[in-house]
Amino acid sequence: MSFTVVIPARYASTRLPGKPLAMIAGKPMIQHVCERANESRASRVVVATDDARIEEACRGFGAEVIMTSPNHASGTDRLEEVARKLQLDPDHRVVNVQGDEPLIPPELINQVADNLEQYQEAAIATLCERIHDARQVFNPNVVKVVFDARGMAHYFSRAPIPWARDFWPAGAATQDVDLPDGIGYFRHIGIYGYRASVLSEFVTWLPAPTERVESLEQLRALYNGALIHVDVADRPPAPGVDTEEDLARLRALMEKGGARG
């Protein structure tokens, strides 16, 4: 079955304004993301933006663009608007690829779409990778996920989950713990696949209490009973771009030919 990739791209950014149009190896960042998405098995790749500058740049390299409302409270709301405007069937799969990941492996896009097809009971599919460093487990900027034997998410959190009660002392800090053997710790990777019907439901749900306290939008889906399938990524994800330092590192890497542009 076919699936559509939607790439939300906003010009406004607190830390890096105009990020989608930042030049990397002679191309705007959003073009690199589109090229990677087009290497997946997606039947269609669409950029969703509320900014005319991004629209103009995308049309300049031949991308399909849909202009969306500037008033969306979340990226999922923007995604739902695109699915509605495209008149997608309820069972159609929509993969959300972030516009600041110019090195995203196309294989991960396919993996999310395939998992959504394989696990029909899941409303959403996403990915994770194993954590080997306790500092990441205790880092609130690293979102952890716990899931069951079928890969269905129990919970996502910025806290260290699961807590190793008999292994870590009360008040344990990053510098004085190791990861216990026999249990995996997993970092959530922010790529999602949705069924179009779920997007329509999602935008009707109020923010969940857990979502508000953790600032994690996917908790709204769990709170409302939607199943989220989580799979270990087939290959390591590439880093995204959040800051000027991230951008400088990526430019140096790609301009030296250390990564395909």
From Swiss-Prot:
- Classification via InterPro entries: Cytidylyl_trans, KdsB, Nucleotide-diphossugar_trans
- Reaction catalyzed: 3-deoxy-alpha-D-manno-oct-2-ulosonate + CTP = CMP-3-deoxy-beta-D-manno-octulosonate + diphosphate
Q: What is its EC number?
A: 2.7.7.38
Keywords annotated in UniProt: Cytoplasm, Lipopolysaccharide biosynthesis, Nucleotidyltransferase, Transferase
Per the record, the pathway is: Nucleotide-sugar biosynthesis; CMP-3-deoxy-D-manno-octulosonate biosynthesis; CMP-3-deoxy-D-manno-octulosonate from 3-deoxy-D-manno-octulosonate and CTP: step 1/1; Bacterial outer membrane biogenesis; lipopolysaccharide biosynthesis
Specify the signal sequence span.
Answer: none
Q: What does this protein do?
A: Activates KDO (a required 8-carbon sugar) for incorporation into bacterial lipopolysaccharide in Gram-negative bacteria.
UniProt lists the family membership as follows: Belongs to the KdsB family.
Q: What is this protein called?
A: 3-deoxy-manno-octulosonate cytidylyltransferase
* CDD domains according to UniProt: CMP-KDO-Synthetase
Gene Ontology CC annotations of this record: cytosol
**Gene Ontology MF terms:** 3-deoxy-manno-octulosonate cytidylyltransferase activity
The question of whether Transferase is a record keyword is answered with yes
Q: Where does the record say this protein resides?
A: Cytoplasm
What is the predominant subcellular site recorded for this chain? cytoplasm
